[in-house]
Amino acid sequence: MTLYKIGEIVYKNNNNIILESKGEGNLVTICDNSRYSKGEKLKLYLYEVKNDYIQQTYGFKTFKERLLFTDLISIDKIGPKTAMLILDQNWELVANLIAEGDWKEISKINYISDKSAKLICVELKDKWAKIIQNKEVKKFDDITNIKELKQTLNKLGFKASDIDYAVNNISSTKELDLMVEESINLITTQMHANNQTT
């Protein structure tokens, strides 16, 4: 089983990318696709679904995102496509909703019934509360701000890799306008530093 591959995205079309790694082109289905850009070099965690009806490889930015995917597809009536739709909402947001047992918010996701949302929380709440217990469970508003920040920076024309850098290094998640301002400063500082080393 291949856990991850390191390569470059040479093609992107919505939620499908081709990851070139060691001279091979790998067709991979992703979620939350604004995080990815053509030409980006990255480590992509993989999960392959192979049976009589389908052979498809799914890709994830982090191991925890992949772990959440495998946990979701272990739930009755949740297949890979539905799990990817759930993760499309931002996997960290979903993980925190599960840890908080907020099935009502999860049920607002397309194709997720109240019954499925409740089952997800019952089956996975304790596990994901433990996984993220080293951090304080983020409030819903904070997660929403991060999502809005990503959308704003994307509209401003920043690349997915720059947006991820800003989100991972930002110091506050309270006020969106301050987050945007700090993110732009972080990205421009990083770009300037990269230019000096090249």
Swiss-Prot record:
Swiss-Prot/TrEMBL keywords: Cytoplasm, DNA damage, DNA recombination, DNA repair, DNA-binding
Region feature Domain II, mapped onto this chain: 62-139
Bilayer-spanning residue ranges: none
MF terms in GO: DNA helicase activity; four-way junction DNA binding
Subcellular location: Cytoplasm
Pfam families cross-referenced by the UniProt entry: HHH_5
Biological process per Gene Ontology, one example term: DNA repair
Spans annotated as Flexible linker: 140-144
Entries under InterPro entries matching the protein: RuvA, RuvA_2-like
Keyword flag DNA-binding: yes
Region (Domain III): 144-198
Chain positions covered by the region annotation Domain I: 1-61
CC terms in the record's Gene Ontology section: cytoplasm; Holliday junction resolvase complex
UniProt keyword Iron-sulfur present: no
Family: Belongs to the RuvA family.
Record's function text: The RuvA-RuvB-RuvC complex processes Holliday junction (HJ) DNA during genetic recombination and DNA repair, while the RuvA-RuvB complex plays an important role in the rescue of blocked DNA replication forks via replication fork reversal (RFR). RuvA specifically binds to HJ cruciform DNA, conferring on it an open structure. The RuvB hexamer acts as an ATP-dependent pump, pulling dsDNA into and through the RuvAB complex. HJ branch migration allows RuvC to scan DNA until it finds its consensus sequence, where it cleaves and resolves the cruciform DNA.
Entry note about domains: Has three domains with a flexible linker between the domains II and III and assumes an 'L' shape. Domain III is highly mobile and contacts RuvB.
Subunit comment: Homotetramer. Forms an RuvA(8)-RuvB(12)-Holliday junction (HJ) complex. HJ DNA is sandwiched between 2 RuvA tetramers; dsDNA enters through RuvA and exits via RuvB. An RuvB hexamer assembles on each DNA strand where it exits the tetramer. Each RuvB hexamer is contacted by two RuvA subunits (via domain III) on 2 adjacent RuvB subunits; this complex drives branch migration. In the full resolvosome a probable DNA-RuvA(4)-RuvB(12)-RuvC(2) complex forms which resolves the HJ.
The protein's name: Holliday junction branch migration complex subunit RuvA
Biological source species: Mycoplasmopsis synoviae (strain 53) (Mycoplasma synoviae)
